[in-house]
């Protein structure tokens, strides 16, 4: 039987594409543009897994489709190659992280090329290349000049095992680090911060302008966390000190019975009484060991200590005890809250625990039993009594402003971005600190500030990066003799990925980040595909940098990525025992369609789970390509289900995709291909062209492949295949299975040219119309025959055709036909006696 020999065909076409630079980005100014971007990978030692090609295949299908439609297509690939794993590996083995990274990149590139993706490799970038990070550093100097990069002494999330501080976004809900799962503690350190908060409102508002999944927009909205309320100033009794509280409910001020400061609040030490000093100091020490997430966990027991001081409630002059508690964060709002225990669950639990006063100021509920958190008419609130929420807030804000103790305020949950890392393997921050107390950015002509090669890359332990050990690099002298030290912190891995999509547009430019005309031509990115796990971090940071570059006049668009799509996760096959515990695949015996634990004999339940080394269910694409071919892997991953669904890997599904490609190969290479069109496949072909075109546009790749299967089934029923339909079908197939597409195109055309730029087929609407219909013929209401007749045949003609049919002739022989009822396009009913 004829089959598709992937081992011969696929390498042949990969070599052809490379030798001919088939996918070089188009530059014809008269054509429309299409920029298809993948989230570039971190080149890990493990190499590519089968989850990577899912998103890559989707952008590749779109890129191949758009080239055939006459677009200039920019479809690049590169490497997000700084980061902790390479550094950790280097420390464990004594090897240079740059060598390790280069080896990993070579392996990734080999694997990617084996899958037939149409990348323009002339545009390959690597975030660890000094010619690339020169511009990462240049962007940092611009942030510094604009006052958007600054140094601050801040409590950081310190991970002793990693020897570095990490951003809030990198701390898991259980208070451990995202990388490594190590304990995170809070400690104050001098850090570089980026003022992303200056862009909070624009980052929020401009989400309306992009075509992104609503779930991702919501995650960003929640992270930015805009709330409108009021700042209220509270005086500390018997002192000249005061503090400010931000509240979204200034209308409940009459119910504020105590105040809580963050343990780190600047006022704490100066207002604490002698009697309470020891308890306060001990509480502060304990709080410093916890991460923000651990401190604000709603489920944890409320703890706190009274300072011994009182605040004065400005609205009624009542004394409010001032406490410190770790659930209030110095970095959020003003680091102080007014507690209204009658109407806030956390305040209520705290008040009950420490026997503090609870005064209801909204009608409804029983505050002895629980906090009442619904809306209600105001009570116990003097001039607000009888008002609803909106009216009461407005009236209280006016009162606060008239009496000078507060004002309306918009607040954001978003914090400034902690940008420095105490590691070696990252971009050096281009700042010099001089002994006269000033700091300056390294001038543009001296960039890149190259990361020095060193064997000693262990964290210094002092909170500085290993660069602090390299005195030759570290110490500099100005022309006027003033000595200085280079900044020893490096940038986080997020830096290089915050702007990489811009460098693809002009990757070899050594004069500027990218040429302005080229940026204008290619931006924004038309489709960006990657995992939803980057919803907040990477996507928010990239939008922030893009807006800064927009303000600097570097980029012409407000937003970088016009359309975003998150592919689902490919899950591995896994097995669970009766307790629900997962069992590694090498401990499972398959018998008669059931699964058993090899050691215990227990029958196991098959269940999809995330692929992991421990479960031994990670599928390596190299193995799939070797056994089934790259086109099979591509078609299978696109046919598994909707692109955004998470679906379990299945060997049977892979075999099904392979069988389909073999059927296609046989159809085109063994069927008689003819120059005359019999018309038999008109409807099937034009339906397929229309459906596949629409489904690729809508990224419904699974239904597009289903439609290709329908055409193959229809074509196999015919003796001959019209050459134009054979060619058109191969063109529709090519974005999904490009190696097979090229091979079959040559067998049909012998052109020696790639199929890549052949104009995409179009459908003819008139061919979609049915010219024939099937009607039933009944005798006394029972179906006796089915006929295919011309559509809209008249009653008289229909009657003639029905009565002339062999079966009907036999049925009515010797009988008298009383009546014939003919309904065009439906049926003929014959009444006999």
UniProtKB/Swiss-Prot annotation:
What EC number(s) would the UniProt record show?
6.1.1.4
Q: What is its main location?
A: cytoplasm
Which EC class is this protein assigned? ligase
SUPFAM superfamilies cross-referenced by the UniProt entry = Anticodon-binding domain of a subclass of class I aminoacyl-tRNA synthetases (SSF47323), Nucleotidylyl transferase (SSF52374), ValRS/IleRS/LeuRS editing domain (SSF50677)
Give start-end ranges for motif 'HIGH' region: 41-52
Q: Which Gene3D superfamilies match?
A: HUPs, Isoleucyl-tRNA Synthetase, Domain 1, Valyl/Leucyl/Isoleucyl-tRNA synthetase, editing domain
Asked if the Swiss-Prot or TrEMBL record annotates the protein with the keyword ATP-binding, the reply is yes
Keywords, comma-separated and alphabetical: Aminoacyl-tRNA synthetase, ATP-binding, Cytoplasm, Ligase, Nucleotide-binding, Protein biosynthesis
Among InterPro entries, the record links this protein to: aa-tRNA-synth_I_CS, aa-tRNA-synth_Ia, Leu-tRNA-ligase, Leu_tRNA-synth_edit, M/V/L/I-tRNA-synth_anticd-bd, Methionyl/Leucyl_tRNA_Synth, Rossmann-like_a/b/a_fold, tRNAsynth_Ia_anticodon-bd
UniProt entry tagged with the keyword DNA damage: no
Q: Catalysed reaction(s)? A: tRNA(Leu) + L-leucine + ATP = L-leucyl-tRNA(Leu) + AMP + diphosphate
GO terms for cellular component: cytosol
Q: Which family does it belong to?
A: Belongs to the class-I aminoacyl-tRNA synthetase family.
Quote the protein name from its UniProt record: Leucine--tRNA ligase
Q: Which gene encodes it?
A: leuS
